[in-house]
Structures are given as C-alpha cells and as structure tokens.
A protein has these predicted regions:
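A generic secondary-structure signal
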Residues: 72-76, 135
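Conserved GNAT-fold acetyl-CoA-binding loop/helix
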Residues: 51-72
Length: 198
C-alpha cells in the first residue's frame, strides 16, 4: 500500500525503538501506536488474501482494534513484550514480523509474520526472520526460536526450511481458520548454537 509521506498514517522510518536495514531497499522497526492506521488499512486492503491463513483478520473491524492490540503489547515491560516490527520500503508498509509467544524463563520465543502479495517471492521475509533470529539470540538471550505454519501455507513453510529450522512435528488441527476449518500446523525450531553457525 502506497501512502504519501505527508499523510498522518504514512509509515515513518524514524520512529523510536529498534530498527534495522534489511537488504538494500527494506527496513524493519518496532511498531508504535502511530502505525495503527497504516497497519489496519494494509490488512483491510489485503483482507481477502490474508484471512486465508490469518484468522485474526476478521476481528480487525476498525483502526481502534489495531490500536488496542498495539497498546496491549506496548503496556508490557520491554523484556516481557512480544515485539512487533513493521516491514517497510520507503513509506510503504509491506508486512509485519515479530515475536508472538515469548518464554523468558526458558529462553524461547516464537516468530510470526505476514507479507502482502506484491512483496512476496523476493526473499524479504526470509531476511527479516533471519535478522530477528540473530537479534533474539544476541539481544534477548533466547536459546530456542519456533515458527508454526499452517501445513498448506507453502510460502510461510518455505521460510523456516530455507533458514535451516528443524521440523519438530505437526500440531494436529492446531488453528481455527476464518472459514471455520481447523488446519494442522507444522512446528519448526532452531537453536542458538545453530543460529550462531549461520
């Protein structure tokens, strides 16, 4: 989704928090409350595609729903927060990537992600996930990182496979999709020592 930089809901490169350049054209940075409108609009504009694999899409009825989600995360102490990162190119939002379940006691976390169709097939998400794995190990002290993907979602499954994650098994009927059907989830993991050998 293209939004002019003068628009209040444009994706701003220079917000506070962690940010990093991902390849020559793309960046990630921590999402802020100011991003709620552009995140919601991007999801809304791509809802037919995204709802196939992301059951939360139908629950985002208005910008306030995205604001509530971000507020919930931002209210937590930083060490306990499941940090969400925007993926951007200029003032365009391409998708989100972040930590969805973090267990600080056992030093493990899970990464979730989505990318709108026009940016898929370029290796963007693979680079983002790799970067966040390295960051989770070096900055957050994680030992194990997990990714769960619907078994039928080939693009999402390709990312952990490409990065050398181990397929641990299948969580049978692990997620209820928007169409009312349960789908199996492939569960992948990678360890700190494996990430350090990339």
């Amino acid at each position: 989704m293209k939004i002019q930089s003068s628009c209040p809901s444009a994706l701003n490169r220079e917000e506070t928090g962690y940010s990093a350049q991902i390849g020559p054209d793309f960046f990630i940075r921590e999402a802020t409350l100011a991003d709620a409108a552009i995140i919601w609009q991007t999801i809304y504009d791509n809802r037919v595609y995204l709802r196939t694999w992301l059951p939360f899409v139908d629950g985002l009825k208005e910008v306030a729903d995205e604001e509530a989600f971000l507020n919930e995360q931002l209210a937590l102490p930083y060490a306990d927060r499941n940090i969400v990162f925007v993926i951007g190119q200029g003032h365009e939002l391409c998708g989100l990537v972040g930590f969805v379940i973090t267990d600080n006691i056992n030093h493990r976390t899970e990464i979730g992600y989505w990318l709108i169709p026009e940016y898929q097939g370029r290796g963007i998400m693979t680079r983002c996930v790799r970067h966040l794995c390295e960051w989770a190990v070096s900055e957050r002290g994680m030992n194990s990182i997990r990714i769960r993907c619907a078994a039928g979602n080939a693009p999402s499954n390709a990312i952990p496979r490409r990065l050398g994650f181990t397929l641990e098994g299948v969580e049978r009927e692990g997620e209820l999709m928007a169409d009312g059907q349960y789908v199996d989830l492939n569960v992948y993991s990678i360890l700190k020592r494996e990430i350090e050998n990339w």
